[in-house]
Design a protein with these regions (language model features):
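Short, Lys/Arg-enriched N-terminal segments with co-localized hydrophobic residues
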Residues: 1-3
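Hydrophobic membrane-insertion alpha-helices, especially the h-region
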Residues: 12-30
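Alpha-helical transmembrane signal-anchor/signal-peptide segments
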Residues: 32-50
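Short hydrophobic beta-strand that contains or immediately precedes a catalytic carboxylate
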Residues: 52-55, 306
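Membrane-embedded segments
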Residues: 54, 58-145
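Secreted/periplasmic serine-hydrolase-like ester/acetyl group-modifying domain
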Residues: 124-236
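Active-site segments of SGNH/GDSL-like serine hydrolases
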Residues: 234-259
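Long, positively charged, glycine-interspersed low-complexity recognition regions
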Residues: 260-329
Length: 329
């Protein structure tokens, strides 16, 4: 009788857990939004690409893999996004290597990201949430999400406002259940997402732009963990016979002048770092300064996010520079 009593207790607990898990999964399905990272991760794990571009919002808006392919003949996908740190790029690369066979990683380097800490929560989930089950996902969980607030793990949708989520529940649910990755869902008044992962920003009236201070590099303030993951990524690429190239995209001349001390210190630091690592670093604000315009007209803000037309031109230039750098080796 005691056995039955205990068995029922265990069974009850188990059933409550099952119901909780099912409920959390259902809420996640209905409330966690379909982000462009969902499309990006799906693309890179289900298709083979030669070039994978990782990095920040500058890379996302400035680098169009389809334009690059016309020059290099190499297929590519843009996996950059604002808020992507070294740790994310590292585990994204590990995930892709687990599922496919990338030939080259192009890392877009925004110096400001190396002196700041990655924010908890949403910022990790943006990537982690979209990983299919894999060794990379388990490692990524252990080294990032596990250190976050438990709400992040159990209620990934809690950081998105319900007023934003509720009207979209039906669409979110349908898109996930039917495996719908149509890019038209990701279009807005100011930009559109392309299947290649590139986000095309529509041109803006630059005379109306307001200056705001970008994330700046500060000497002696480098976050060790960020550099650690960048080194890990470079080592991982070397061990797996994946070429690694670092790129810093052009910044408008007004901004370069306003913060010249900070930028000069950053270029020196990263120039030296990549040289020590023995990898190619293409900086479009120093040795390739003249390769592309720094006139504000080509951008949508002082920070250096290009409009779509400029990004297409820049991607062609970047592809040519990559080709000639490859031939020099």
């Amino acid at each position: 009788d005691l056995f039955m009593h205990n068995f029922k207790k265990v069974l009850k607990t188990f059933l409550v857990l099952v119901v909780c898990v099912a409920l959390l999964a259902a809420l996640d399905l209905a409330l966690y939004p379909c982000t462009f990272m969902r499309n990006d991760v799906h693309a890179v794990v289900t298709q083979q690409f030669d070039d994978i571009i990782v990095g920040t919002s500058h890379g996302k808006m400035d680098i169009d893999p389809e334009v690059m392919q016309e020059v290099t003949g190499r297929s590519g996908h843009n996996l950059c996004v604002g808020g992507e740190y070294g740790i994310d790029a590292y585990y994204l690369t590990k995930l892709i290597k687990e599922k496919q066979n990338p030939k080259r990683i192009i890392y877009e380097v925004d110096p400001g990201y190396f002196v700041s800490e990655k924010e908890e929560g949403n910022n990790y989930l943006l990537f982690y949430h979209e990983f299919p089950f894999s060794k990379a996902k388990v490692e990524y969980f252990w080294n990032s999400i596990a250190k976050c607030n438990f709400r992040t793990v159990l209620f990934p949708w809690y950081e998105y406002s319900l007023s934003y989520e509720l009207p979209k529940v039906k669409d979110t649910f349908t898109q996930k259940v039917t495996g719908d990755y149509d890019v038209s869902h990701l279009k807005s008044d100011s930009q559109e997402y392309h299947e290649s992962g590139f986000i095309e920003r529509y041109p803006v009236d630059v005379t109306k732009l307001k200056k705001s201070e970008p994330k700046l590099y500060e000497e002696g303030k480098v976050n060790e963990e960020n550099m650690e993951y960048l080194k890990k990524l470079i080592t991982f690429c070397k061990e797996n016979d994946i070429e690694f190239v670092a790129v810093t995209t052009p910044i408008p001349i007004n901004t370069l002048k306003d913060y010249s001390d900070s930028y000069n210190a950053a270029w020196k630091y990263f120039g030296q770092f990549f040289e020590e690592q023995g990898v190619e670093y293409l900086n479009f604000n120093t040795q390739y300064f003249k390769a592309f315009t720094h006139d504000l007209k080509a951008y949508t803000d002082y920070d250096g996010h290009m409009n779509g037309d400029a990004a297409k031109e820049y991607s062609e230039v970047l592809a040519q520079v990559l080709e000639s750098a490859g031939q020099r080796k």
